[in-house]
Amino acid sequence: MKPQELAKEVAKRRTFAIISHPDAGKTTITEQLLLFGGVIREAGTVKGRKSGHFAKSDWMEIEKKRGISVTSSVMQFNYQGKRINILDTPGHEDFSEDTYRTLMAVDAAVMVIDSAKGIEAQTKKLFKVVKQRGIPIFTFMNKLDRDGREPLDLIAELEDLLGIEGYAMNWPIGMGKGLKGLYDRVNQRIELYRREGDDRFLPLNDQGQLDPSQPLTQDSIYTQTLDDIELLNDAGNQFNLKKIMAGEQTPVFFGSALTNFGVETFLNSFVQYAPEPGPKKTEQGGEVNPTNPEFSAFVFKIQANMNPAHRDRIAFVRIVSGEFERGMDVILHRTGKTMRLNNSTEFMADTRETVSTAVAGDIVGLYDTGNFQIGDTIYQGKEPIQFEKLPQFTPELFVRVTPKNVMKQKSFHKGMQQLVQEGAVQLYKTYNTNDYILGAVGQLQFEVFQFRMLHEYHSEVIMTPIGSRTARWINPDQLDEKMSSSRNLLVQDIHGDPLFLFENQYAERWFADKYPDVKLTAKM
């Protein structure tokens, strides 16, 4: 591909993640976006446990049963001349590590907030990560079809709790049973609720008001809306694209994903204002531009058994620069070895199509036979490239894991190896006895691991809790196995690095007092 062609293709890419607290309606809005992208013909009510409909983005068996997202799905489609890459992320807090890594692979984020509840705990956590990255954040205030909090309070909360300016792109005319429509400040029109096609749009005059002949003008809620708009115009934040690009201001859209109200307006604005792929920093201190003709990418996720019939593993890579071509040779930075990328795919949750070419900003799945690790960099060219490390969390909960049937050791070990490589749970082995210990950020990760071991590898496992522990790594040169005591457990991680699992903070303090020269470290 010629340089000008590459630049043109890269400029079409819009790659973003959707973040929210559980049940704010993230999966529902994802489905509506796919509907506009022409990818699906109908959007089911997403809690599949009751309706029998399953969200397109919830593809794993346990997700369908429980109505929660526990993996990051990737969905791609074309819309208005742009190539959209959506990364749907787990809303459940136990899967925040997977979500954090996903946020490293996007150029923007969409924050979905339940307008009845406002900003919730998980949204706060995820917002922090997006804020640290300095990428644009677009806010969708969802569930307008239900009674919720005052819109002015919701805008104020963005500033008070998250420290980001909010600019209302549209404004609700009523809510719940009294919802009449949306006042569109950008397109200077009113979008009526429960109307189809262009009939739902009413133009505003130069004063920002409807023609007096319109029935809505007789409604007191319309008058209240005009007062709110006047207040926003006089005392609210001014739209500032520079601030939006820096992640200092968020455009706020109101709507209802369930009734598909306000979603199309949101998508059109998002495509218009969201950034195209930008440069990415390297460990060497430089940065790689997306229009650099030499291919480079990084692995942000590994997923086993997306197709249970084939027991496959897919490494999800974000292309940072250049053009991907199936069959190309690349260098894996961690090993220095050259490898050929023959098998590649693009996604719609669990369905996939072979992809022959892709460019910077795209997400590609590579069939993995065990070569890749999360955070790996692959590249072409003479100059070695390694992108910045992805975040890794220190687990807080630990269990000892054994196979229930000792005759099924082979499937037990295969399942352990593949699921641990996905990064949702961490694997440790005790010194001398080589017992398997699993670590996780939350209890749900263990439940998902147990479920998948049984259903995907036919290996029933016994998990014995060893409680909440504090994990601290130690320099191998300073390690003496006599340091292990009843207050700590000496283990090694999958890289062979030693660490102690302390019973509590007192045990860690006792250790620090006894061995003042020993340095212990945590992950994130």
Swiss-Prot record:
Residues involved in GTP binding: 20-27, 88-92, 142-145
Alphabetical list of InterPro entries matching this protein: EF-G-like_DII (IPR053905), EFG_III/V (IPR035647), G_TR_CS (IPR031157), P-loop_NTPase (IPR027417), PrfC (IPR004548), RF3_C (IPR032090), RF3_dom_3_sf (IPR038467), RF3_GTP-bd (IPR041732)
Gene3D superfamilies: P-loop containing nucleotide triphosphate hydrolases (3.40.50.300), Peptide chain release factor 3, domain III (3.30.70.3280), Translation factors (2.40.30.10)
Gene that encodes it: prfC
Record CDD domains: RF3, RF3_III
Protein name as it appears in the record: Peptide chain release factor 3
GO cellular component, one term: cytosol
Domain tr-type G: 11-278
Family that this chain belongs to: Belongs to the TRAFAC class translation factor GTPase superfamily. Classic translation factor GTPase family. PrfC subfamily.
HAMAP family in the cross-refs: Rel_fac_3
SUPFAM superfamilies: EF-G C-terminal domain-like, P-loop containing nucleoside triphosphate hydrolases, Translation proteins
Keywords: Cytoplasm, GTP-binding, Nucleotide-binding, Protein biosynthesis
The keyword Protein biosynthesis is assigned to this record: yes
NCBIfam families in the record: prfC (TIGR00503), PRK00741.1 (NF001964), small_GTP (TIGR00231)
Single biological process term from Gene Ontology: regulation of translational termination
Localization per record: Cytoplasm
Presence of keyword Transport: no
Protein purpose: Increases the formation of ribosomal termination complexes and stimulates activities of RF-1 and RF-2. It binds guanine nucleotides and has strong preference for UGA stop codons. It may interact directly with the ribosome. The stimulation of RF-1 and RF-2 is significantly reduced by GTP and GDP, but not by GMP.
